[in-house]
Swiss-Prot record:
Disulfide bonds: none annotated. Residues 190-236 form the F-box domain. This is F-box/LRR-repeat protein 15. It comes from the Eukaryota. Keywords: Leucine-rich repeat, Repeat. LRR repeats lie at residues 237-258, 280-303, 317-341, 348-373, 397-423, 441-465, 466-477, 478-503, 519-542, 550-574, 589-612, 614-633, 640-652, 653-678, 734-756, 758-782, 785-809, 813-839, 882-893, 894-914, 915-937, 949-973. InterPro entries: F-box-like_dom_sf, F-box_dom, FBL15-like, Leu-rich_rpt_Cys-con_subtyp, LRR_dom_sf, LRR_FXL15/At3g58940/PEG3-like. GO terms for biological process: plant organ formation.
Length: 990
């Protein structure tokens, strides 16, 4: 809330409205903004100046805050207009026509209770000012007949004040009107008549702030009266608002029962404050500041009997060099902050809270026997004796803040402790002269001693004499070396940037928060607590000893504690002092070499960056997560038992011995464990095992694993040269095996695979250079692996005949990869169709012979022949029956010259870097992406190729030397479906 409308609610204005027929002259908001001074002042229009037209504001009803109010409003809404009328709607012109048909007598009938007309769109209420500017004279007609009760041509000062207030508010906050200032509307409106009772309207208005109340006052007379109710105007906030004395007096006379006034930052703040204190007899809270406050103001406060709270800030009191007297019998809270004054004398028998923070008085005389809170922080001119005198004069004092008062001494604190037996909170931060010697504060609960140079280990003896202490802050106490406290009620302690601090010993059953950081000399920590749940001690580089007896501790973070030894593992085992531990972080603890945990509650363990760890043994039946990134020297690992569901040991290249007992594990990755020779894997639910590059893994280990993990579905044995026929024969114990990767192995015979893996769907044999040409004959001659869908023979040495037979017979394959096959020659299905028919006839007598290609559709979807140097021609006619082929990749086939494809479902074709390509014929109506990077095709060839691709969206022609970038428009003309054409700068050769 910023500024308030008050005089616009007078009866005289209502009479003026009736006399003028409720007419509103159309004004421009821009005119009002031109008359403003831009500094947050109220805008005052001259007598001959036209007042700005204020847009009609939307009424927002908060249904969630007042269901009863919304239900009542909904009843009026539905009873006024049938539902079908709301659904069908009316045009803006219809609304204007209806408005023009209304007579002036109807508009003024029962002016006090006249209806507020709300124009509603589909989802929100709108004003009728939304009629388009194209309507011409109809706009003024609507304004004349459906006026919301704003005064007409002869505007009163109070109406203009209300408008000026809203304009100032919007300008100050940098917001624009929500209204439609140009009198136009981009949607059709509906006119809805709503009769709201005074009680219901009062309830709705209770949810509005003062700015919205001012806007609502301009709707109609009933709303004006309702929004002026004094219940809504008990708090008058003019903070940083330039309000004149006349306006403020009018406000005070209009609302004499206001209880709270804020004129902080207003001009003539002293006069405004005097007026508020002398006029508003029910004033309880007064806030002033930013200016000169005279002594007479403080004298006038005594006459304001209901006053309870006064705040004065950023002000000069009196002439700055005189004594200010303040006397009040009922004042309970006083704040005089950042003020310039020589001396203060305060007599307030009921005062409970006093703040003089950052004021520069040299003396403060207090007569406040019931004062409980005294804040004199940063009062640098207050001497030690003045502070002592002020504090001991308040025997009921419970909270004292003397931070940044450099003159405070131990003697002053001792006398305060004797005089104020109920002192609970003491903030003596940045007081270099105190050491708390002989200071007894038995009732103290909060003690803050930030940056106190006199606090040493000897001070802990006197702190220990405060048995009720709950919060202790010792940050930046540079002379503090040891802290040893036995305080049963201590709940929180903070030790930050204590450079010489070496030893911490805390015995407190209620301790729940410990903050220790940037203490480079800290070596030993001993903690006993039943309430501590989380302990974070990051970057304590010299910490060597940790003793914990914390039965509720659940999370521990010891990251970058480089000096911690293996003995720390005993603390977090079942026989240690943390039986409820769930999460342990030991990242970058580089002194750990052998980690052994036996903990029945531990669920998460992180050893990231522990490069010296060579042995890991976990007996944690509930552990579900472990992170070993950076443990690249780990040699032996035992997980017996654990609740892990997945484990990645591929980042442990030196792992040689592995023992896992994990009843819930489903995924295990050993990729890169090149020296792993002994592995016992007891994971009955394991479905995925990746043992890539485990060069020492042998047949006996594989056989034992398949026997103990019968549910394996995916097995990766890439680069496992020690695996032979015996190990592959053991795969018959895996009935669910569907994915097998034997790439980069020395296999010569695939017979064990064909016999043991009947359900296999994916077989990868990349770079198996020892396979003979007859190794795959069972696939296309005997019908082996009938469920096989994906086959990868990349970088193999199979001859052209074996490849041709495989392509001709294995029509059930969906994915085939022949990347880098040097024996791969032309893919010409056009010239071999008759040959293939004869070929199938040879094996027709066999029961396992597959259906001939002439009668069976090929299921191939993805064919990859990347980098096959001997392919020169690719021909796939309709007779080849590649009805499912969607992706064909022939990139890097440098000798490929001719491509002729007729594939009805081909979506992606990659011919990038086929630098010899000359002929491209495409009959692919569904082709969406064509890649021709670095090809020597000319523009005519590309145009001819894409002319039959009606669905082509992406065409890549980058680095094509015979194609100019300026010719891209031709391709779009030939193929209108193109959305993306990639080309390089013009490289067209002459």
């Amino acid at each position: 809330m910023r500024i308030w409308c008050f005089s616009c609610f007078t009866d005289e204005d209502e009479d003026e409205e009736d006399d003028n027929g409720g007419r509103v002259k159309k004004q421009s908001l821009a005119t009002a903004m031109d008359n403003s001074n831009g500094d947050g002042d109220f805008v005052n229009f001259g007598e001959n100046e036209r007042a700005p037209r204020v847009p009609r504001w939307r009424l927002r009803l908060c249904a969630e805050e007042s269901e009863a109010a919304w239900a009542e409003l909904d009843r009026f809404w539905t009873s006024e207009i049938p539902l079908n009328q709301l659904v069908q709607g009316e045009s803006s012109s219809n609304v204007v026509a209806e408005a023009e048909d209304c007579t002036m007598e109807e508009a003024d009938h029962d002016s006090y209770h006249k209806r507020a007309k709300v124009y509603s769109g589909l989802a929100e209420c709108r004003s009728v000012s939304g009629v388009s500017s194209d309507a011409g004279n109809s706009v003024s007609s609507v304004e004349r007949t459906v006026s919301f009760g704003i005064a007409s041509s002869s505007r009163t000062d109070t109406d203009m004040f209300c408008q000026n207030f809203i304009l100032n508010y919007n300008r100050k906050d940098g917001k624009k009107d929500d209204g439609d200032d140009n009198g136009s509307s981009d949607t059709e409106d509906f006119e809805v008549h709503i009769d709201l009772t005074d009680d219901l309207l009062h309830m709705v208005f209770s949810f509005l702030n003062h700015v919205d109340l001012c806007r609502s006052a301009m709707v109609c007379r009933q709303w004006r009266v309702a929004s002026a109710h004094e219940d809504f105007w008990r708090v008058l906030n003019f903070e940083n608002i330039r309000i004149s004395m006349e306006q403020f007096e009018n406000m005070c006379s209009r609302y004499p029962n206001a209880t709270e006034v804020n004129v902080y930052g207003a001009p003539a703040v002293n006069a405004l404050a005097m007026k508020a204190a002398t006029t508003l007899r029910n004033l309880e809270v007064l806030t002033i500041g930013k200016g000169h406050i005279s002594e007479s103001f403080f004298q006038a406060l005594g006459e304001c009997n209901m006053l309870r709270s006064v705040t004065v800030s950023d002000a000069i009191l009196g002439n700055g060099a005189q004594e200010i007297h303040l006397s009040h019998d009922r004042l309970r809270e006083l704040k005089i902050t950042k003020c310039r004054v020589m001396r203060l004398s305060i007599r307030c028998p009921q005062l409970r809270s006093l703040s003089l923070k950052r004021s520069n008085m040299s003396q403060a005389m207090l007569n406040c026997p019931l004062l409980q809170l005294l804040d004199i922080a940063s009062c640098h001119k207050l001497l030690d004796a003045a502070i002592r005198s002020a504090a001991i004069s308040c025997p009921q004092l419970e909270s004292l803040d003397v931070s940044n008062c450099s003159c405070v001494s131990d003697e002053t604190l001792r006398e305060i402790a004797q005089a104020c037996a109920n002192l609970h909170i003491l903030n003596a931060s940045y007081c270099p002269n105190i050491s708390l010697e002989s200071v007894h504060l038995p009732m103290l609960t909060v003690l803050k001693l930030h940056s106190c140079e006199g606090i040493t280990s000897a001070s802990m003896t006197w702190i220990a004499n405060s048995p009720a202490l709950e919060v202790l802050e010792l940050d930046n106490c540079n002379l503090l070396t040891t802290v040893s406290l036995h305080l049963s009620r201590l709940q929180s302690i903070s030790l930050v940037h204590c450079r010489k601090f070496t030893d911490l010993n805390l015995q407190s059953i209620m301790l729940s928060s410990i903050t220790v950081s940037n203490c480079p000399a800290l070596r030993r920590i001993t903690i006993t607590s039943n309430a501590l749940r989380r302990l974070a001690l990051q970057k304590q580089e010299n910490l060597t000893t940790l003793v914990l007896q914390c039965h509720s501790l659940q999370e521990v973070d010891l990251s970058d504690c480089e000096s911690l030894s293996n003995s720390v593992c005993k603390i977090f085992s079942d026989d240690g002092g943390c039986p409820m531990l769930k999460s342990l972080i030991l990242d970058n603890c580089e002194s750990l070499t052998a980690v052994r945990f036996c903990n029945s509650s531990l669920a998460s363990l992180s050893l990231v960056g522990c490069r010296a760890v060579t042995s890991l043994e976990l007996k944690c039946p509930r552990i579900e997560q472990i992170c070993l990134d950076g443990c690249d020297h780990l040699e032996t690992a035992f997980f017996q038992p654990v609740a892990l569901r997945s484990l990645n040991l591929g980042i442990c290249p030196k792992l040689s011995v592995l023992n896992i007992e994990a009843p819930y594990m489903v995924s295990l990755e050993l990729k890169g464990c090149g020296v792993l020779s002994e592995a016992s894997i007891m994971c009955p639910l394991l479905t995925s095992l990746d043992a890539s590059f485990c060069s020492q893994l042998r047949d006996d280990c594989l056989s034992a694993t398949t026997a103990s993990c019968p549910l394996i579905e995916s097995l990766v044995l890439m680069s496992c040269p020690s695996i032979g026929s015996d190990g592959l024969s053991s795969l018959n114990g895996l009935p669910n095996l569907t994915v097998l990767d034997l790439s980069y192995t020395f296999l010569m015979n695939l017979e064990p695979v064909f016999k043991s893996c009947i359900q296999l769907k994916v077989l990868k044999l990349q770079a198996c250079k020892y396979l003979t040409d007859s190794s795959l004959e069972p696939l296309y001659k005997e019908g082996a692996l009938p469920a096989l869908e994906e086959l990868d023979l990349s970088y193999g040495t199979l001859c052209q005949t074996a490849i041709d037979d495989l392509l001709a017979c294995c029509t059930h394959l969906t994915h085939l990869s022949l990347n880098g096959c040097v024996n791969m020659h032309d893919l010409d299905w056009g010239s071999t169709s008759v040959h293939l028919f004869d070929y199938f006839g040879v094996y027709s007598s066999s029961d396992n012979t597959q259906e001939p290609a002439e009668t069976a559709n090929r299921l191939l979807q993805n064919l990859n022949c990347v980098g096959c140097p001997n392919i020169r021609k690719v021909l796939i006619p309709p007779a080849a029956r590649f009805y499912h082929l969607s992706t064909l990749n022939l990139s890097l086939s440098v000798n490929l010259k001719e491509v002729d494809l007729t594939c009805s479902n081909l979506v992606l074709l990659n011919l990038s870097n086929c630098c010899s390509l000359e002929v491209l014929k495409l009959g692919c109506p569904r082709l969406a992406s064509l890649f021709l990077q670095s090809c020597n095709m000319d523009e005519a060839g590309v145009e001819a190729a894409i002319s039959g691709c009606s669905s082509l969206e992406t065409l890549d022609l980058r680095f094509c030397p015979k194609i100019s970038s300026v010719s891209m428009s031709k391709f779009r003309t030939v193929c209108p479906s193109l959305k993306r054409v990639f080309s390089s700068p013009n490289l067209l050769q002459d």
